[in-house]
UniProtKB/Swiss-Prot annotation:
Residues 1-16 form the signal peptide. The record marks K121, K124 as: Important residue of the cationic membrane-docking site (MDoS). The lineage of its organism: Eukaryota, Metazoa, Chordata, Craniata, Vertebrata. Snake venom phospholipase A2 homolog that lacks enzymatic activity. Is myotoxic and displays edema-inducing activities in mouse paw. A model of myotoxic mechanism has been proposed: an apo Lys49-PLA2 is activated by the entrance of a hydrophobic molecule (e.g. fatty acid) at the hydrophobic channel of the protein leading to a reorientation of a monomer. This is Phospholipase A2 homolog PLA2-03. GO terms for molecular function: calcium ion binding; calcium-dependent phospholipase A2 activity; phospholipid binding; toxin activity. Residues 121-133 are annotated as: Important for membrane-damaging activities in eukaryotes and bacteria. The record marks K128, K133 as: Cationic membrane-docking site (MDoS). It comes from Ovophis okinavensis (Ryukyu Island pit viper).
Length: 137
């Protein structure tokens, strides 16, 4: 479990409910899958540094933009509730902010799953100085 936490921290840096995002990815994709994204491309990990290198990197870019749009919420600290129903992630709770944070994490998790075939090992630990200016959110 400690490894999962470290991987989650690498995945989104200081953004979001790291434990929950890491758990969500782990549950959706299996053991060890989350660590593939810790330093991937220009947008996975801490900061948003450039144009996405591929569809997998775009998942991280879209996730960070999703957080950025949550102006009345604090995705860095807001914890949320979610469950699995018939293989689908279901965001719960009555608080609109935490539900929106959950929806951002859910979208990222599904994006990673749906783009597994675009994952390219050459971007696994990508030098950030090669990243070009990021696209606007």
């Amino acid at each position: 479990m400690r490894t999962l936490w470290i991987v989650a921290v690498l995945l989104v840096g200081v953004e979001g409910s790291l434990i929950q995002l890491g758990e969500m990815i782990f549950q959706e994709m299996g053991k060890g899958a989350a660590k593939k994204y810790g330093l991937y491309g220009c947008n996975c990990g801490m900061g948003r540094r450039g144009r996405p290198q591929d569809a997998t990197d775009r998942c991280c870019s879209v996730h960070k933009c999703c957080y950025k749009k949550l102006t009345d919420c604090d995705p860095k600290t807001d914890r949320y509730s979610y469950s699995w129903e018939n293989g689908d992630i279901v965001c719960g709770g009555d608080d609109p902010c935490t539900k929106e944070v959950c929806e951002c994490d859910k979208a990222a998790t599904i994006c990673f799953r749906d783009n597994l075939d675009t994952y390219d090992k050459k971007y696994k630990i990508f030098p950030k100085f090669l990243c070009k200016k990021p696209e606007p959110c």
